[in-house]
Amino acid sequence: MTTYLTRDGVEITPVIFGTSCLGNLYRVLPYETKLEIVRAWFRAAAKPTIDSAGKYGAGLALESIGRTLRDLAVPSDGITVSVKLGWRRKPLTTPEPTFEPGVWAGLEYDAEQDISYHGIMRCYEEAVELLGGARGIDLVSVHDPDEFLAGGGTVDDILGAYRALFELKKAGRVRGVGIGAKDWHVIRGLYNDIKFDWVMFACAPTILRHPRELREFMHKLEANRVGIIDSALFNGGFLTGGSMLDYRKADPVRDAKLFQKRADYLAVCKDFSVDPAAAAVEFGFRQPGVVAVSLNTSDPARIPMNASYAQHHAPAEFWAELIRRKVIDDEN
C-alpha cells in the first residue's frame, strides 16, 4: 500500500518508519537489533519509507541504515529514504556529545548545526557518504528550522539552505523538498517564501492539540497539493500513558488540563475497546491533507503493528463520544 506525497508523484508508504533509535537514542542498541528492525520494515512493506537525520546519533543512524541495507542486499531502489539536514559530525572532545546531552548513548562523534546554502550542501554530501555513497536520498528537508531561529539563526540562512535543496532537486539528485518542525507557525511563515513539496508536523495535530488555526493552514496546504506527514500523534508518548510530553517531562500542575484530557481519552478508548495508539494514528489520518504518519520504535516486534495502524477504523460512535466529552473538537 502506497500513497502520493508530492505533486510530482513521489510514492511513500502511509506509515513512515522513524530511525532515531538507530542512532542510539537513550541507549546503545546492538547491531543485531538494528538489523532486525530493518528486516521488519521489509516484512511490513514491500518498499518501506524511512525518515532519518544527520543529527540522529551524530550520523550513527545514517551509518546504521547504510550498513544494514548493504548486509541485507537491498537494492538502491528498494527503499524510499527521507533525510532531515542541518547537522554535521565533528570530533567528540567531551565526555558526552554537546548537541543534546543525555539523549544519545555510546557515540563516537559530536555534531554541530550547519544551516546555510553551503552548510546544507555539506550536510547533504555527508549524509550520502554515511549511507554508503552509492545509495541516494529521495526526500530532503531542513532539520528543525524553528529551533535554528530560536537560537539566533536567520531566515536568510534558511532561505539559502532551501535554495540549495531545490537545486539538488532540479539536478535530479533528490525527488522532493520539504520541511519538518515542532512549531507549525514557523512552517506557515516560511511557506510564504518557500513552496514546499511536503511538510511534517512534529507536535500537532494530535488528540490533545489540534487548534483550528492549524487545521485552516492544513486545508490551504491540501488545496495546493502539498503532502502532509503527521509525526506528532502521541505527544512524545504522553497520550498513551508516558511521562514525557513533547520533548519534556510532563508536570501534573502545569499540564493539569492535558492530564485530564488524557484520562478522558483513555476512558473512552476503554469503553469502546479501542486501542489508544491505533486511534491516535487514525486521528492523524483524519486531519486535512495528511497522507502519512511517522512512527518510531526500537522494538522490531512492534513494527508490523505500527504498519497496521494505517488500516485502523474506530466506530463513528467512538469519535462522537470524544467530541461530546470535549476531548477533540467537532471536525465539521
Language-model-derived ranges and their functions:
Residues 1-84, 89-91:
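N-terminal binding-site loop/beta-alpha segment at the start of enzyme catalytic domains
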Residues 7-9, 43, 69-76, 129-135, ...:
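Acidic (Asp/Glu)-rich catalytic clusters
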Residues 20-32, 105-121, 151-152:
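Active-site mouth loops of central-metabolism enzymes
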Residues 33, 125, 129, 138, ...:
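Beta/alpha (TIM)-barrel catalytic core signal, keyed to glycine-rich beta->alpha loops juxtaposed to Asp/Glu
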Residues 79, 83-96, 232-240:
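Short, solvent-exposed beta-strand-terminating loops
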Residues 92-103, 243-247:
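Short, flexible, mixed-charge acidic loops at enzyme active sites
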Residues 113-136:
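An active-site-proximal structural segment forming one wall of the substrate-binding cleft
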